[in-house]
Curated annotation (Swiss-Prot):
Residues 329-687 are annotated as: Uridylyl-removing. Belongs to the GlnD family. Modifies, by uridylylation and deuridylylation, the PII regulatory proteins (GlnB and homologs), in response to the nitrogen status of the cell that GlnD senses through the glutamine level. Under low glutamine levels, catalyzes the conversion of the PII proteins and UTP to PII-UMP and PPi, while under higher glutamine levels, GlnD hydrolyzes PII-UMP to PII and UMP (deuridylylation). Thus, controls uridylylation state and activity of the PII proteins, and plays an important role in the regulation of nitrogen assimilation and metabolism. Its EC number is 2.7.7.59, 3.1.4.-. Residues 688-764, 794-863 form the ACT domain. This is Bifunctional uridylyltransferase/uridylyl-removing enzyme. Keywords: Hydrolase, Magnesium, Multifunctional enzyme, Nucleotidyltransferase, Repeat, Transferase.
């Protein structure tokens, strides 16, 4: 043993606790001095010695017909600092009262020492009966390892679990694969979530265990080395699995050393500490990102090889007696029982461009897969390539052909990524494989996100997508050639991690790619523009005032034409949806639809003049009047006009006819001082909070504090002040998950806002610390946009999205006598990226001195 415990001849829980702590300290101090396998072996030896000594001291070794058997991870000798001690006490017959007491004493002692114990007491008959009924018990028994006691009795157990009538090889295989399918579903079928589980995520240690279990049930192979010697895996597969296993072991061991309670999740705060223990260096996030890149690449290799070998077992062992049906596809490919196979194992080495045809055939035959033998030949061929596939003219032609095939992304590009073909084709791809960004916004690695953007684009094709993405569906389904959009998606983030502006660098890369692949000048320019501008629509819709004609004109000028607007709309929506499933909601849909429609109108009108919103104002008035006449026949035109004359024209531009009619129906006969109403019926994409009252100090502060305290997300705030000093305030909110607010929650918020607005006190902030935010720093940044505007000032704020941020900002506005006219609230992971339209106390744009003062106060107070 590397670590020799100094346990006395008479064990006590306190002495064992001290030795456990000494062992942990030894491991921390020597983590980089020994191989991870030596550390795990050493810990297992420590447990073996402890349990055997305890077994003897309690007197169980003196009993006949009773044995101590390690099972589970302990049986495999995979013991990490916080692993459970799983063991079986095997008895020949039901224990006597005396033996039961000794067993209880044995287990209680281990609990008193602080161990997490998983134990069972069974006879051989019980092992057989319960093992047949429960695949988990059966698996534990397969991994059983003798510690002490009656060895012949253990040998009988070993023979029992190998019998075909215990679990047949096929039944055992199917049950374990079904467990894997269910586990993958829990993790959304991806290893690339940014807070992964080392054990259970796809590609994690459980995938290795599945491989062990299948081999163990089939041939009795207990280790990876034994599986290699059996010929079931190739030497290069063994080498990759061994390296990946060693890295995951190191990460898990380090994680357990820094935790107090058992957990295998690499949460953000833990990633920092684990990367330090593993020796990754770099200021700030790079060290974590380097470690996680290695981690995700290990997951990918394990997932690829273990699933390939499981498929190989199914096809070559379990299905070996199946009738063979062969369909010849061409000189090099054939279908054997609905699996794509090579007719000659050297095809890919001799004609590497044919690798692309393998995936072309996947798009042509919806229900076929690639045979495991062909996949293994593919892996061998990729390792032997002397050049990138894109350097081969025939491969370039085949690569471009894939984009316009049915289900090209799902059936060709996703598998090409999975099997390493994209890395073999694109020089830049390897740099983003497994590349995470240490933030809360991007929940997938860059390569996984990229494929999800492409897959989302493909999902715009079916008619069923029209409800959620009406504009993107209409555009994408009408494109005769979708190649440019798919290529733009493939390259939009390809330059991340290099430093510099990834959009600019990516634009250069995609232009080089397009030129190499023979695209014409117009296509090259369009691709470069799409990649360079892929964030422009998102920024404009979410962080600019899209009701400002100058904003629309500037955006239209950047688009240049309808085709580019259409392309960028599809790419932007797909990018948002593929970044984080919670980002896209009905409010976002309405924002992007409005910007798209305004830009279309600008193109239609011509680019010489700004959009004339007076026509929109007049039309909204007219439509609102029609709604009121139809739905509220008791309201007179005179009373409507009396109310509307109090409102600035801006009110009729920024609200829909339905909203205007709703507000009017509430206010024409209203004589009270305060009105708070919340509805889902009249606002596009969110729940509208409408507030009418006399303007008062801290109004915005009170509203946002109350909404935040009730756990809602604020997306938009619109402050309209009438000529006589009343406010028509509208806030668009949703639940935190993006859903509309249900009736009971709306009534609750109405009451809370009414109380807050009637009180002279500011509401107390309910601040619940966010675990994830504690480990991020965001530099507070203030930017003033379009400083030449005279009527108002536009300000953009970037800061850590901590609780109470909006209330804090509004308090600053109040202290500096600033009026808030409009706000857009955007959360980007741990960052708040908020947009405000302000005037000073005289209703004018802020002077330079006022802007400098505001900037100084925000930077000072918001950290």
């Amino acid at each position: 043993m590397l670590f020799s415990p100094t346990l006395s001849s008479l064990l006590t829980p306190s002495a064992v606790k001290i030795e456990r702590e000494n062992l942990k300290q030894f491991e921390l101090e020597n983590f980089s001095c020994y191989s991870i396998f030596e550390l795990i072996e050493n810990r297992c030896d420590f447990y073996d010695a402890l349990l055997i000594q305890l077994w003897q001291e309690i007197g169980l070794s003196e009993q006949q017909g009773i044995s101590l058997i390690a099972v589970g991870g302990y049986g495999r000798r995979e013991m990490f600092p916080l692993s459970d001690l799983d063991f079986l006490i095997l008895v020949e017959q039901t224990p006597s009262h005396e033996i039961e007491e000794k067993i209880t004493q044995f287990i209680q002692f281990l609990w008193d020492c602080g161990f997490e114990v998983g134990n069972s007491v069974r006879t051989l008959e019980q092992c057989e009966l319960e093992g047949k009924q429960d695949i988990t018990i059966a698996t534990n028994l397969l991994e059983a390892r003798f510690l002490t006691g009656n060895r012949p009795h253990f040998d009988v157990l070993n023979e029992l679990v190998k019998r075909a009538d215990f679990w047949s090889k096929e039944d055992f295989f199917n049950a374990k694969v079904q467990e894997q399918i269910e586990r993958y579903q829990r993790y959304h079928n991806t290893a690339y979530n940014l807070e992964p589980d080392i054990k259970f995520s796809p590609g994690g240690l459980r995938d290795l265990h599945l491989l062990y279990w299948v081999a163990l049930r089939h041939s009795g192979a207990l280790t990876l080395e034994a599986i290699l010697q059996s010929g079931f895996i190739y030497p290069q597969e063994y080498q990759q699995l061994q390296e990946s296993r060693a890295f995951l072991f190191k990460v898990r061991f380090a994680l357990h050393l820094i935790l107090k309670r058992y957990d295998n999740r690499l949460l953000f705060d833990r990633q920092i500490k684990v990367s330090e223990l593993l020796g990754f260096r770099g200021e700030g996030n790079p060290a974590v990102e380097k470690m996680m890149k290695c981690f995700f690449q290990a997951l990918h290799r394990i997932s690829l090889i273990s699933n390939l070998l499981i498929q190989h077992y199914r096809e070559n062992v379990l299905s070996s007696n199946q009738d063979t049906v062969i369909d010849q596809l061409d000189d090099d490919f054939q279908l054997i029982n609905q699996s794509l196979c090579l007719r000659n194992s050297f095809v890919f080495q001799e004609k590497p461009a044919r690798i692309l045809d393998l995936f072309f055939y996947l798009t042509q035959y919806e229900h076929v897969n690639i045979h495991s033998d062909t996949l293994r030949q593919l892996q061998i061929s990729l390792e032997q390539l002397s050049q990138k596939l894109c350097e081969i003219p025939a491969a370039r032609e085949k690569f471009l052909r894939l984009f316009n095939q049915s289900n090209a992304i799902k059936r060709a590009f996703m598998p090409m990524h999975q099997y390493g073909v994209l890395t073999a084709y694109l020089p830049q791809w390897q740099a983003i494989e497994g590349l995470m960004q240490f933030d809360l916004f991007h929940i997938y690695t860059v390569d996984e996100h990229t494929l999800r953007v492409m897959l989302k684009l493909e999902s715009f094709l079916p008619k069923g997508s029209a409800q959620e993405h009406p504009i993107a569906h209409r555009i994408f389904s009408q494109l005769s050639d979708r190649t440019l959009l798919y290529i733009a998606a493939l390259f939009h983030d390809i330059a991340k991690g290099r430093g510099g502006d990834h959009a600019e660098l990516g634009a250069e890369d995609v232009a080089d790619f397009a030129q190499l692949h023979g695209l014409d000048r117009r296509e090259i320019d369009t691709l470069a523009w799409l990649v360079q501008s892929h964030l422009l629509m998102s920024i404009t819709a979410q962080r600019r005032d899209i009701h400002d004609p100058e904003v629309v004109m500037n955006f239209a000028e950047a688009m240049q034409n309808q085709v580019r607007l259409d392309y960028l709309t599809c790419l932007t929506v797909a990018d948002i949806c593929a970044t984080n499933g919670n980002l896209w909601n009905s409010w976002k849909r309405s924002l992007f639809a409005s910007l798209y429609e305004f830009t279309e109108q600008q193109f239609s009108q011509g680019m010489k003049e700004l959009l004339d919103y007076s026509e929109k104002s007049a039309e909204n008035r007219k439509l609102a009047q029609q709604i009121l006449t139809q739905d509220y026949s008791d309201i007179t035109s005179i009373s409507i006009e009396k109310l509307w004359t109090r409102c600035p024209e801006d009110y009729f531009v920024r609200n829909t006819p339905k909203q205007i009619a709703w507000h009017t129906s509430l206010l024409v006969d209203f004589v009270e001082a305060l009105l708070v109403k919340i509805s889902n019926r009249f606002s596009l994409g969110g729940t509208e909070v409408f507030i009418y009252c006399q303007d008062q100090p801290h109004l915005f502060n009170k509203v946002v504090s109350t909404i935040g305290a009730k756990k809602f997300s604020i997306h938009d705030a619109q402050i309209i002040t009438t000529q006589d000093g009343y406010v028509f305030d509208s806030f668009i909110i949703t639940e935190l998950n993006g859903e509309l607010v249900e009736f009971d929650r709306r009534r609750e918020l109405e009451q809370a806002l009414t109380v807050a607005l009637q009180s002279e006190k500011l509401p107390a902030l309910s601040i619940v610390p966010n675990r994830q935010l504690q480990h991020f720093t965001v530099q507070t940044d203030v930017r003033f946009l379009q400083e030449n505007k005279k009527e108002h000032t536009e300000m953009e704020l970037v800061a850590l999205d901590k609780a109470g941020l909006l209330a804090q900002v509004s308090q600053i506005f109040t202290e500096l006598n600033l009026n808030l006219l409009n706000a857009k609230i955007t959360t980007v992971g741990e960052k708040a990226e908020d947009f405000f339209i302000l005037t000073n106390q005289f209703g004018q744009a802020l002077a330079r001195e006022e802007r400098e003062r505001l900037n100084s106060v925000i930077i000072q107070q918001i950290r």
